From Swiss-Prot:
Assembly: Part of the 50S ribosomal subunit; part of the 5S rRNA/L5/L18/L25 subcomplex. Contacts the 5S rRNA. Binds to the 5S rRNA independently of L5 and L18.
Bias kind Acidic residues: ranges: 193-205
Keyword rRNA-binding attributed: yes
Name of the protein described by the UniProt record: Large ribosomal subunit protein bL25
Keywords, alphabetical: Ribonucleoprotein, Ribosomal protein, RNA-binding, rRNA-binding
PANTHER family attached to this UniProt entry: RIBOSOMAL PROTEIN L25/GLN-TRNA SYNTHETASE, ANTI-CODON-BINDING DOMAIN-CONTAINING PROTEIN (PTHR33284), RIBOSOMAL PROTEIN L25_GLN-TRNA SYNTHETASE, ANTI-CODON-BINDING DOMAIN-CONTAINING PROTEIN (PTHR33284:SF1)
GO molecular function, one term: 5S rRNA binding
Keyword rRNA-binding among UniProt keywords: yes
Purpose of the protein: This is one of the proteins that binds to the 5S RNA in the ribosome where it forms part of the central protuberance.
């Protein structure tokens, strides 16, 4: 997935908390660019550009172009720190990549075809174990989300990662087991109805036994 996010950066001369606070007073966000075969570089980014990019969603799973005096480089955001009160971006780590660089990213799981799920039709509940999954992806092919198809799943069934179709070249980072993404459970009402049906079934054999005793 290519990116349309472009962020302007400037090399940050000063380091330490004092320099970082001074940058934030100017609505600049301190950051670092690292990875590849180049040395890490301390930078500042425009606060308004960061806010706009964050509003667009999927900031941590998009390829980003950083522009320094007309020269561009492709990166991906690996971490972003926010102020605990104002929720403003405080620091960003940017990792240098190209189209084929393999990286670990958390990708959202979207559940589809709920209307074709017998468990939900019967009043069951979808218990989501993982709202997102960690995947190993080429930087140029990061999916925005993956789809988990609920078609045909009934109460008591589980949906595992092997049931989710992943794009070419994308694999789960957990490889030692077929981990669970969601389960289908009966609601309290469904379970109560089932228990009542179970309680009623012995009545007929009991009646037959009593009739035999009378004879």
């Amino acid at each position: 997935m290519s990116s349309n996010i472009v962020l302007t950066v400037d090399v940050r001369e000063g380091t330490g908390k004092g320099a970082a606070r001074a940058a934030r007073r100017e609505d600049l966000v301190p950051g670092i660019v690292y990875g590849g075969k180049l040395d890490p570089v301390s930078v500042t980014l425009r606060g308004n550009e960061i806010r706009k990019a964050l509003l667009g969603g999927h900031f941590l799973s998009n390829m980003i172009e950083i522009d320094h005096k007309g020269k561009r480089q492709t990166v991906i955001a690996r971490d972003i720190q926010f102020h605990p009160v104002s929720d403003k971006a405080m620091h960003i780590d940017l990792y240098r990549v190209d189209e084929d660089t393999k990286i670990n990213v958390n990708v959202a799981v979207n559940f589809t075809n709920e209307d074709a799920c017998p468990a939900l039709k019967r009043g069951g509940v979808l218990n989501i174990v993982r709202h997102d999954v960690e995947l190993l992806c080429p930087a140029g092919s990061i999916p925005e989300s993956v789809e988990a198809d609920l078609t045909g799943l009934d109460i008591g069934d589980s949906l595992h990662i092997s049931a989710i179709k992943l794009p070419k070249g994308v694999v789960p980072t957990i490889t030692d087991r077929d981990f669970t993404v969601a389960t289908l459970q009966g609601s309290r009402a469904v379970l109560t109805d089932a228990e009542e049906e179970t309680d009623e079934t012995p009545e007929e054999p009991e009646a037959i036994r009593q009739k035999g005793d009378e004879e």
